[in-house]
Amino acid sequence: MDLDMIRSQINQLDEELVALLEKRMELVDQVTAYKRATGKPVLDTSRENAVLERVGKLVQKDDYRSAIQATFSDIMAQSRTYQSSKLANHEQ
């Protein structure tokens, strides 16, 4: 397989990932609304730790575990930033 074919497959996966991440962010909007209504804080460390543990168990190839968990940590960090922004804009 040549590099262009590999990159084409990566591009296809990127498209799928973007669609899944948008669906995830739609759910983050619902979480934000819930937190706004209940006064819960944006950061839930126990939830994030549970997600990272669960994700780590899902990874089948040990060599990928750390990178995939780091990716999910980044996703959750971006979700927190988004939630904080939405909550701050709602208060104004």
Predicted features along the sequence, with ranges:
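Domain-level signature for soluble enzymes in the chorismate/prephenate branch of the shikimate pathway
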Residues: 1-92
